[in-house]
């Protein structure tokens, strides 16, 4: 009503500003052209995996656009940020957005960690060689580390993982100072009450060991 009456109302929306000045930015650490090429291949393969699955089993679904919309975040993270368990410290904890699992499968196939048979049986697990719809450590214990579906649970569990890492360090049980928790949240997922309810915990505990993007 105020806006309709011509009253100037402040908004929380601000123009995009790069927080790093151009003269302070370093060179990209990787082979940008090669990474772009691999990124394009992964994005295509993820879409084809879902399309093929629906061709043979009508209505099986698969969230064809989730990975495509946020794939830059995950690919740069995998190439340059996420730390595995074989490096210094305990490694990072990556909670994948569940609907983006086709993209993670596509990359794993490109790396030779999944077979053609696996890819051809996306969302068809009864035969024994299929791939689960979402990150599911019980169904695929050698592939997925953390569950992140139903929608909203990933954000909540990621925050509690970050808090638990801090607890382990403060109690002298494990040195988790180098470990980071990563979670990429979908825009629709942010409407789930579970997603937002634990943000107060992260703020109250001062958890600077978790990175969440939307």
Predicted segments, located by residue:
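Core catalytic machinery and nucleic-acid-binding channels of phosphodiester-processing enzymes
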Residues: 62-66
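Cofactor-binding active-site loop characterized by glycine-rich and histidine/acidic residues
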Residues: 30, 34-42, 46-56, 67-205
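Short, intrinsically disordered, charge-balanced linker/junction segments flanking boundaries
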Residues: 1, 206, 212-214
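RNase H-like, metal-dependent ribonuclease domains
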Residues: 20-30
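Short internal beta-strands
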Residues: 94-97, 210-214
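Terminal amphipathic helices with adjacent charged low-complexity linkers/tails
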Residues: 1-22, 89, 97
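Short glycine-centered, acidic/aromatic-flanked micro-motifs in structured strand/loop junctions
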Residues: 60, 185-186, 214
């Amino acid at each position: 009503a105020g806006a309709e009456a011509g009253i100037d109302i402040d908004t929380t929306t601000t123009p995009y500003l790069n927080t790093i000045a151009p003269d302070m930015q370093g060179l990209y650490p990787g082979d940008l052209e090669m990474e772009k090429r691999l990124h394009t291949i992964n994005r295509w393969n993820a879409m084809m995996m879902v399309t093929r699955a629906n061709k043979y089993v009508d209505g099986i679904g698969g969230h064809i656009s989730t990975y495509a919309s946020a794939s830059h975040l995950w690919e740069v993270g995998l190439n340059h940020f996420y730390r595995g368990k074989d490096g210094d410290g305990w490694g990072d904890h990556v909670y994948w957005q569940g609907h983006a699992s086709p993209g993670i499968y596509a990359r794993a196939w490109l790396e030779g960690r999944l077979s053609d048979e696996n890819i051809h049986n996306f969302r068809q697990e009864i035969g024994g060689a299929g791939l689960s719809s979402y990150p599911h450590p019980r169904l695929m214990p050698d592939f997925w580390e953390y569950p992140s579906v139903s929608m909203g649970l990933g954000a909540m569990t990621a925050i509690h993982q970050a808090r638990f890492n801090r607890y382990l360090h403060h109690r002298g049980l494990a040195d988790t100072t180098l470990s980071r928790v990563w979670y990429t949240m979908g825009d629709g997922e942010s409407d789930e009450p579970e997603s937002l309810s634990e943000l107060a915990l992260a703020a109250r505990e001062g958890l600077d060991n978790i990175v969440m993007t939307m």
